[in-house]
UniProtKB/Swiss-Prot annotation:
Pfam families: NLE, WD40. This is Ribosome biogenesis protein WDR12 homolog. Required for maturation of ribosomal RNAs and formation of the large ribosomal subunit. CDD domains: WD40. Its main location: nucleus. Keywords: Nucleus, Repeat, Ribosome biogenesis, rRNA processing, WD repeat. Belongs to the WD repeat WDR12/YTM1 family. One of its GO terms (cellular component) is PeBoW complex. GO terms for biological process: maturation of 5.8S rRNA from tricistronic rRNA transcript (SSU-rRNA, 5.8S rRNA, LSU-rRNA); maturation of LSU-rRNA from tricistronic rRNA transcript (SSU-rRNA, 5.8S rRNA, LSU-rRNA). WD repeats lie at residues 109-146, 148-190, 197-236, 260-298, 301-339, 345-385, 389-427. It comes from Aedes aegypti (Yellowfever mosquito). Residues 13-97 are annotated as: Ubiquitin-like (UBL) domain.
Length: 427
């Protein structure tokens, strides 16, 4: 039995439709369609089949289509011709729920450029070129401005957060990393440790998943590992004299220093508690093994890398470069230096990139062209959405909280976009 979508004198295709999202499955039969069928018509077909089978989601969902792992953006027959795929064989076409468009929610105005941003739960932490940190609610209320650094803040990361207390860290061009303790109810903050050891500005920071260590990369080309313990050198109950010393010095040295890059380390991420990955202006991405205190492997590019993001969902690395492009790498591959995909869409330097923490296919990027773009890594030729709002360069982006896509820029603002949950991801 075959269902037909046909027209006069048009080429025909035999189509097998399938999906990995079982709640949207249609009858497993061949479909005879005309070659120039559009995505809109395929959507009508699938929703009609869902309705006929009594599926309650029929008509509520739009779908995208993949052939051999690549999105089909043009009429199907044209897609086949461009890729020299035979019309004689049955076409195996996968369909997936189209991701809902993020909605602009808020604009958080600061006094200077916003160069770092990270969300956790209902709170947003930002770092600025006026040397301050700021804490906001995800509803747009400003809670606290935090002075302390004496040069622009280039990176921030949450260590822990509950209803009573938050701990976070900041990295600055003043060559220091500061560890902060925030009393949530009193809305007061204290710098509990100043991490010293870098000899030039610190450009990036990240905490491991167990939140026991943090890593920093600097213009001094060094990667340093630090304890995130708010207590002095792990003392559980310091004596009065030790407390006085802590109050006056609050200085911490690195647990480990790793050399290997030749230029600025622009991005750092933890793969696991013993493995890190860094990007650098020296055209390399390096994977580090802390047990060996050295480099495990490296990826060599042809341009500087300005940032990178590692996905714990798919094990892939996405990297940003000054040539306007983003590149996808598989660090597990024996051909790790070969680019799996190049993503075209930005018109100026790409400064920041972050994977979704809940969807293995999606990531966001921010660039000097004032744009934030949302990508599906299966669609390299164009982003699936452009998040409009910034009036100047985008310096940082974040998707730590799955509900919000955040971006900071040289227009002194953080843009907050509400990230909708696809029907297929809802519990």
């Amino acid at each position: 039995m075959a269902l037909k979508i046909t027209g006069k004198s048009e080429g025909q295709l035999q189509l097998h439709l399938y999906t990995k999202q079982k709640q949207f499955a249609v009858p497993d039969v061949p479909y005879s369609i005309r070659a120039n069928v559009s995505n809109k018509e395929l959507n009508v077909l699938i929703n009609t089949l869902l309705k006929d089978s009594g599926n309650s989601e029929a008509g509520k969902v739009e779908f995208d289509f993949l052939l051999n792992g690549e999105f089909v953006k043009i009429p199907l027959g044209q897609h086949l011709k461009e890729r020299e795929i035979s019309f004689e064989d049955t076409v195996e076409l996968e369909y997936v729920e189209r991701y809902p468009a993020p909605e602009p929610q808020d604009c958080l105005l600061h006094d200077d450029w916003v160069s770092a941003v990270e969300a956790k739960d209902n709170w947003i932490l930002t770092g600025c070129y006026d040397n301050t940190l700021n804490i906001w609610t995800t509803k747009g209320k400003h809670k606290l401005t935090i002075p302390g650094h004496i040069a622009p803040v280039k990176g921030v990361t949450w260590i822990s957060l509950d209803e009573e207390k938050g701990v976070f860290a900041s990295a600055s061009q003043d060559q220091t990393v500061m560890l902060w303790e925030w009393n949530v109810k009193a809305n007061s903050v204290e710098c509990v440790q100043v991490c010293k050891g870098h000899e030039r500005g610190v450009d990036c920071i990240a905490a491991n998943r167990s939140k026991t260590r943090m890593a920093t990369g600097s213009w001094d080309t060094m990667l340093k590992i630090w304890s995130t313990d708010v207590r002095n050198d792990g003392d559980s109950q310091p004596s009065t004299s030790k407390r006085q010393k802590l109050d006056t010095e609050k200085a911490r040295t690195p647990v480990l220093t790793l050399a290997g890059h030749r230029e600025c380390i622009s991005g750092v991420q933890w793969i696991d508690d013993n493995t890190l990955v860094t990007s650098s202006w020296d055209h390399t991405i390096k994977i580090w093994d802390l047990a060996l205190s050295g480099i495990k492997s490296e990826i060599c590019g042809h341009k500087s890398f300005f940032d990178l993001s590692y996905s714990h969902l798919n094990g892939l690395i996405i990297a940003a470069s000054p040539d306007k492009n983003l590149r996808l790498y598989d660090p597990k591959s024996n051909q790790g230096t070969i680019v799996k995909n190049t993503y075209l869409g930005h018109t100026q330097w790409v400064q920041s990139v972050r994977w979704s923490t809940t969807n293995e296919y999606l990531f966001v990027s921010g660039a000097y062209d004032n744009h934030v773009k949302l990508w599906d890594y299966r669609s390299p030729k164009a982003p699936i959405f452009e998040l409009i709002g910034h009036e100047d360069k985008v310096l940082a982006c974040d998707w730590s909280n799955p509900k919000f896509i955040l971006s900071g820029g040289s227009d002194n603002s953080v843009r907050v976009f509400k990230s909708k949950i696809a029907i297929g991801e809802q519990k």
